[in-house]
């Protein structure tokens, strides 16, 4: 199992055929349902209310920052919905370490290598805080920092566990709702930041490749 997980991780990072990679990743992840999300894992985040996946592609916003757009995508089989979970640059966390509630994380879009980002620009449809993708390998700032908040009594992030991601700079929670983009196909909906805690702020780690927990001390 460990070998197959690592092989799938390599395929994901090298950008293998999207359909085959998606199918293989889902098969691997279903076998380890409920395991811990670790740094270096490549996962899809599912919005609890609408079941859309957090998604991005190399298409800029037509307003606000003009940075790479982020949306909610209704289809499961799409390789543009994979995100690599990374620690903050000044953290001592290593690949394979479990992630506790309160940790500051970054999410790197697998395909474009840009970071999930937010700032004070208004989002296109609702006028909330814009969420974009920005930067790249070796280019990251505090606008890419998100604090993990686990719902309930859990202390360590696991697959299928309800979580919120709160943007460190703006205080906005990663949020989505059923406001749809007309110019984007496939029923894509707005992702934005909202400072209030709402049911629409809740996400779950879903399909993906979950790296084994690092047991070394």
Predicted segments with their positions:
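Lectin-like carbohydrate-binding module/patch detector with strong preference for beta-trefoil
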Residues: 2-4, 8-217
């Amino acid at each position: 199992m460990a070998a197959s997980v690592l092989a799938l991780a390599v395929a994901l990072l090298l950008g293998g055929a999207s359909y085959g990679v998606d199918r293989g990743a889902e098969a691997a992840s279903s076998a380890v349902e409920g395991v811990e999300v670790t740094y270096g894992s490549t996962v899809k985040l599912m919005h609890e209310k609408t079941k859309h996946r957090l998604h991005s592609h190399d298409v800029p916003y037509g307003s606000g920052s003009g940075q790479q757009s982020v949306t909610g995508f209704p289809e499961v089989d799409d390789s543009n919905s994979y995100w690599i979970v990374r620690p903050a640059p000044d953290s001592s966390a290593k690949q394979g370490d479990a992630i506790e509630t309160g940790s500051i994380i970054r999410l790197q879009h697998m395909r474009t290598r840009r970071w999930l980002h937010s700032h004070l620009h208004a989002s296109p449809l609702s006028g909330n805080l814009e969420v974009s993708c920005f930067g790249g390998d070796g280019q990251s700032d505090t606008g890419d920092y998100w604090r993990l908040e686990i719902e309930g009594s859990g202390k360590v992030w696991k697959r299928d566990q309800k979580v919120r991601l709160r943007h460190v700079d703006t205080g906005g929670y990663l949020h989505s709702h059923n406001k749809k983009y007309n110019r984007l196909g496939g029923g894509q909906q707005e992702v934005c930041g909202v400072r209030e805690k709402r049911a629409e702020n809740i996400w779950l780690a879903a399909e993906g490749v979950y790296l084994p927990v690092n047991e070394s001390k």
